[in-house]
Regions:
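Domain-level signal for soluble alpha/beta catalytic cores
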Residues: 1-193
């Protein structure tokens, strides 16, 4: 309530838990311990939703499913299919920021589980490499995601932050600005100004 009373109307959770749940290595690890991923996912969902209870109607809440972002490396891989029916359908947030900058994140099919009215922010621009993405390829991927979510509920962003920790990623300031410029150009071309 302190943040809200100070004027904050948008909070984004950076939730690495869900990213780990997608990882086949993590899934094998917990299975060896006799833990079911579905049970663990449902418990985390319950806890998250409990923490979000009673929020004011004009407070926007979003979740970034983070896969780790330390000095241009990552911590987890795997498509969203193992968590989609739980997280995308039932977490009480307004939007999901999802990493889709490389093959580690799988395809867009799990987006079919996103509850009606929720938005998906497609992280198609990597923050881990200075290489600038091809505009036409990114636009094609947005339209591929549109098979599962209407275009008016899709957005575009970098896959994660440029400096999720003090050391940051292996990009110069100019390379970061060029990526943000690309996001803006693509967004204007796809959704208009």
């Amino acid at each position: 309530t302190d943040l809200y009373n100070a004027g904050c109307r948008s909070i984004q959770f950076d939730d690495c838990t869900w990213g780990m749940f997608c990882d086949p290595n993590y899934q094998a690890f917990i299975a060896q311990a006799g833990v079911k991923l579905e049970d663990q996912a449902n418990e985390y969902l319950r806890l998250n939703n409990l923490a979000l209870e009673g929020r004011p109607a004009d407070l926007a809440l979003t979740t970034h499913v983070c896969r780790g972002n330390y000095h241009s490396t990552w911590a987890s891989r795997g498509g969203y299919a193992p968590i989609a029916p739980v997280l995308f359908a039932h977490e009480n947030v307004d939007a999901f920021y999802l990493e889709f900058d490389d093959e580690r994140s799988g395809n867009f099919e799990p987006l079919q589980y996103v509850a009606e009215g929720k938005k998906v922010v497609l992280g198609l621009i990597t923050t881990k490499s200075p290489r600038l993405e091809d505009k036409a390829s990114v636009i094609a991927r947005i339209h591929e995601a549109e098979k599962y979510i209407p275009l008016d509920r899709l957005c575009l962003s970098p896959q994660c932050g440029f400096a999720s920790c003090e050391i940051g990623n292996k990009l110069t300031d100019l390379e970061q600005w060029n990526k943000l410029k690309l996001v803006k150009e693509i967004a204007e071309e796809v959704w208009g100004k």
